[in-house]
Regions:
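Helix-loop-helix hairpin linking two adjacent transmembrane segments in secondary transporters
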Residues: 150-179
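C-terminal ends and interior cores of transmembrane alpha-helices
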Residues: 83-100
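Glycine-rich segments within core transmembrane alpha-helices of 12-TM secondary carriers
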Residues: 49-61, 132-155, 159
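Membrane-helix boundary and inter-helical linker elements of multi-pass secondary transporters
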Residues: 41, 71-72, 126, 156-162
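Pair of pore-lining "gating" transmembrane helices in MFS-fold secondary transporters
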Residues: 7-38, 104-111
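Intracellular juxtamembrane helix-capping segments at the cytosolic ends
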Residues: 34-35, 113-129
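Short extramembrane helix-to-coil loop segments that connect adjacent transmembrane helices in Major
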Residues: 40-47
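Cytoplasmic membrane-interface "Motif A"-like loop-to-helix N-cap segments
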Residues: 71-83, 161-170
């Protein structure tokens, strides 16, 4: 890996983090697709500014609670518990996607996205020191770029085969892989 400049002892953690970020970004893209499609079929687009403001307010509370609950905790433990919570909650929302659960999904997908990416970069920062990060973080970010391409191209065939109502299960799958 001389082109990428990764030392032999860094290969395994770099590869794992690459695929972890690939999975997180894939979950984000598939989840956002479901969130947007379901919301915009049931609610007028004029409600989007309200959703954006609500997300900001909710995230302020979530971040404060997150900091309190995770202080001093092992990052891998936090990611594992969060991944389980995210997967279970999305599964429950999937089975109740009507009425007020649609805006809840819209907001919750943003919470899942922000916390997952936040947790990933904290973990990457714990694994690699600043010197290593300068060399390796570009590769990790590429995992997200590949996910953008893969998920972007893969959503249409997935929906054609399994139906749009099952796209949230793909999101749950990617969250599970990322843990």
């Amino acid at each position: 890996m001389a082109i990428i400049n990764i030392k032999s002892k860094e290969r395994k953690p770099a590869a794992l983090l690459f695929f972890m970020f690939f999975s997180i970004v894939s979950a984000t893209i598939t989840g956002a697709s479901v969130r947007d499609a379901v919301f915009l079929t049931q609610f007028d687009k004029s409600y989007l500014p309200v959703m954006f403001i609500t997300i900001a307010v909710v995230m302020a509370g979530v971040i404060a609670l997150y900091k309190k609950l995770t202080a001093g905790q092992d990052q891998i433990f936090v990611i594992s518990i969060s991944g389980a919570l995210f997967s279970i909650s999305l599964f429950l929302l999937q089975s109740n996607l009507s009425g007020l659960f649609i805006p809840v999904l819209y907001i919750w997908m943003e919470v899942v996205t922000i916390l997952s990416i936040f947790q990933f970069w904290i973990l990457a920062g714990e694994i690699f020191n600043a010197r290593q990060a300068k060399r390796i973080f570009t590769l990790l970010g590429a995992g997200g770029s590949f996910a953008g391409m893969g998920a972007g191209f893969g959503i249409k065939p997935f929906v054609s085969t399994f139906g749009s109502e099952n796209l949230l299960f793909l999101t749950i799958f990617f969250i599970g892989i990322s843990v």
